[in-house]
Amino acid sequence: MTASERVVVKELSSSLLDMKFMLKKKKQIETKAAKKKEAKLDQLITEKEAEATCSTEILKSSEPKLEICYDYAKLENLKFGRLSFGGFNKEVELLMEYYEKLQNGMLSDSDDDGMDVDDEEMAKSLGGQKLAALDKKSQSKRERRQQNERNEETTGGRRFNIKDIRKRFAADDVADAPERKFMKPAEDC
């Protein structure tokens, strides 16, 4: 066959290659494709190596665009991360002012003492009710019974809940108001 008589053969379809009698041909085609791909990659690598050895200038694209730094020294002069302007988020603006003063040296770190809550606020929150609950736990049965008896004496022997208190206040309001009676309509003769 001469070059002019050669017929260009298209690749066989995948369904035809999946048939049992065509499996050998399929393996041959796959190995040829893998060899071609490998040859192209080898050629590209040799071209790149030749360019790199021939050129004396440093490629600008090889410079790193990102810099990874594990040292905090470069991050010292950063501003507070959250921003708010024009009173849209007042809490964030207060934090911005605080960190700005801290950075400028107007405030010192020792002013904070690492406490989130002042001593006065802590005393108020842990005050009366919580201490009373702790005292109640440490009381004996006799002491608790005596305290309940005292409470019953002041309330008249009744235990009140919220509904009872509401009814009592509603009854007091009605007692103060003038009594309303049903009035018969006037007879017009």
Curated annotation (Swiss-Prot):
Biased amino acid composition, Basic and acidic residues: 133-161
Pfam families: MPP6
InterPro entries per the UniProt record, alphabetical: MPP6
Entry similarity comment: Belongs to the MPP6 family.
Location of the region described as Disordered in the Swiss-Prot/TrEMBL record: 124-161
Protein's GO biological process: maturation of 5.8S rRNA
Protein name: Protein F29A7.6
Disulphide bond pairs: none
